[in-house]
Curated annotation (Swiss-Prot):
Lineage of producing organism: Eukaryota, Fungi, Dikarya, Ascomycota, Pezizomycotina
InterPro entries: LexA/Signal_pep-like_sf, Pept_S26A_signal_pept_1_Ser-AS, Peptidase_S24_S26A/B/C, Peptidase_S26, Peptidase_S26B
A UniProt-annotated Pfam family: Peptidase_S24
Any one annotated GO CC term: signal peptidase complex
Entry similarity comment: Belongs to the peptidase S26B family.
Enzyme class: hydrolase
Main location: endoplasmic reticulum
PROSITE patterns per the UniProt record, alphabetical: SPASE_I_1
Name of the protein in its database record: Signal peptidase complex catalytic subunit sec11
Enzyme Commission number: 3.4.21.89
Quaternary context: Component of the signal peptidase complex (SPC) composed of a catalytic subunit SEC11 and three accessory subunits SPC1, SPC2 and SPC3. The complex induces a local thinning of the ER membrane which is used to measure the length of the signal peptide (SP) h-region of protein substrates. This ensures the selectivity of the complex towards h-regions shorter than 18-20 amino acids. SPC associates with the translocon complex.
């Protein structure tokens, strides 16, 4: 009787160890993501190109690394932005930039002895598109605000690696299969 109880206790310990190991992997991945987000100053420091609008510079499925520490975006720079009200990252090139001075804010900051920098407005366009992005922006929006809309500027990429993400979003059943396989691996893994 005692040996049967000891065997069940050993199995319970193994199961708990497997669950804790899986939780450790997930929490490590989350901490790495948050760390990269803080260093890059971007809410989404790694994005996948979802369309062919930036060909030939970037292909669909390329994995992009973003940096959002610059105060200004230059014409010709490739940026990633989110349309207000939608959470879909768009990768396009800055084709026009201008600053819009807010006289009330400037007076307020000058009076307080703080430096005033006029907000930068940007117009973007995909390299493979005929027209600029004004049709993609939120209703009534003609330009992107550098501080509010830009997720980051592209600083590097790995070709094709992000295609797995595209496959998982286009074929939802693949997520189920992948999660099932991962779950079975955790359950049947023996150390």
């Amino acid at each position: 009787m005692l040996s049967a109880l000891g065997g069940n206790l050993s199995n319970a310990r193994q199961s708990i160890a497997q669950v804790l190991n899986f939780a450790l992997v997930l929490s490590t991945a989350f901490m790495l993501w948050k760390g990269v987000s803080i260093v890059s100053n971007s809410s989404s420091p790694i994005v996948v190109v979802l369309s062919g609008s930036m060909e030939p510079a970037f292909q669909r499925g390329d994995l992009l690394f973003l940096w959002n520490r610059g105060e200004r975006a230059e014409v010709g720079e490739i940026v990633v932005y989110n349309v207000r009200g939608k959470d879909i990252p768009i990768v396009h090139r800055v084709v026009r930039s201008y600053t819009e001075e807010d006289k009330k804010l400037k007076a307020k900051k000058t009076k307080a002895g703080l430096p005033y920098v006029a907000p930068q407005k940007l117009l973007t366009k995909g390299d493979n598109n005929l027209a600029d992005d004004t049709e993609l922006y939120a209703r009534g929006q003609e330009f992107l605000d550098r501080k509010e809309d830009i997720v980051g500027s592209v600083r590097g990429y790995i070709p094709g690696v992000g295609y797995v993400t595209i496959m998982l979003s286009e074929h939802p059943w693949l997520k189920t299969v992948l999660l099932g396989v991962m779950g079975l691996m955790v359950v049947f893994q023996r150390e």
